[in-house]
Amino acid sequence: MIRGKVFYKGEFVEAGIEVENGRIKRIGKLVEGKEVKGVILPAGIDVHVHLRDFAEKRKETIETGTLSALHGGICLVVDQPNTKPPVDDAETYFRRMGKAEKSVYVDYALNLALTNSNHGKIGSIMRKISERYFVPAVGEVFIQHDSEDLQIDYETLSSVYKRFEGVVFTIHAEDPAYVARGSPNFVFRRREAEVLAVERLVELGKFHFCHISTKDSAKEILNSNSTYEVTPHHMLLSVEDYGRLGNLVNVNPPLREREDVEWLFRNFHRIDVLASDHAPHTLEDKEAGASGFPGVETMYPLFVNLASKGYISFKTLVEKIASNPARIFGFKGYGEIEVGNYANFAVFDLKKVDEIRAERLHSKCGWTPFEGFEAVFPDKVYLRGKELLENEMKAGNVLKKRV
């Protein structure tokens, strides 16, 4: 049992939390417990991470990626299946989950890839996997990708989507007509690529759009029944950072002009999900032009600092990083500090403002685009009532069947 300033039902209250068998039994002013310093927030959910491993384990592994998530106040990550090899069949899915079962510091779920090799049999693949594991979504589906097998055209996506009522499809929306194949440089990935793809896709169905980076795309989705996520780097960095970061700046979709960046941040309350798109590469690979940023460890701390300073509200932050991801992807028992839910929370001392330094982070890639940014990292992280940070305990679970 712990006591402190708990974020409960949309506001902070002085209360205690009693935990039994990993779940919250009671919350109230009369509940006794160990007093903690700072605010007690729901632990975050990052629905978009690329934990590499397999043939790219020199960049990141499931073990190092989930350790990084733990230190960032995240209790559950959703890994993307565009690995090498891609997770587009049951055997590869089971192999990756078996690897995760032995090594995760936080809870772990894995999406299923939609490829040109598997789209005709994805139903049977999904049924086989679902006998053992909970699959949050099909995706991230790439409308544009350097791999011909991973690049799915609109017609194929529409055909598959219509066969799977109730399944979440997550989309990387960049129209291939506007993207130079094989080039990660932002000059060749025009903002029109995202806008055009979103305009077409919202007419085809209800999707969850990954890493939206332009105001026009966001407005289009807001007028539909789809949902979308935005990354910290698309709200806190811009093309102006190219001079500071050099080749490190490469990311898909690319960093945008200040107009888009400022609109997304001003409208943070209107987005559905805050997700990191944690996509680590070594410095050597980045210098060679690889696209992607690490971010699972810095996302929550960056935005806790912004909330502490009044730029955003804690209510909005908790919605975007915890309760909305749980609702959209069906993670029952996650996302809110509430009786019956898992006792997953993070304690942040708002007076402990640090500067982000790569050498203190835990991702295997060894760098961050947010070097020198102010952040508030968690002092304690609880997963099903166990405090994990002090001893870096591997207490995570893989999500089995339906949560």
Curated annotation (Swiss-Prot):
Bound cofactor: record note: Binds 2 Zn(2+) ions per subunit.
GO molecular function: allantoinase activity; dihydroorotase activity; zinc ion binding
Cofactor: Zn(2+)
InterPro entries: Amidohydro-rel (IPR006680), DHOase (IPR004722), DHOase/Allantoinase_Hydrolase (IPR050138), Dihydroorotase_CS (IPR002195), Metal-dep_hydrolase_composite (IPR011059), Metal_Hydrolase (IPR032466)
SUPFAM superfamilies linked: Composite domain of metallo-dependent hydrolases, Metallo-dependent hydrolases
Binding residue positions for Zn(2+) 1: 48, 50, 140, 277
Annotated pathway: Pyrimidine metabolism; UMP biosynthesis via de novo pathway; (S)-dihydroorotate from bicarbonate: step 3/3
GO BP terms, alphabetized: 'de novo' UMP biosynthetic process; purine nucleobase catabolic process
EC number: 3.5.2.3
Catalytic residues, chain numbering: 277
PANTHER family given in the database record: ALLANTOINASE (PTHR43668:SF2)
NCBIfam families assigned to the protein according to its UniProt record, in alphabetical order: PRK04250.1, pyrC_multi
Name assigned to this protein: Dihydroorotase
Gene transcribed to yield this protein: pyrC
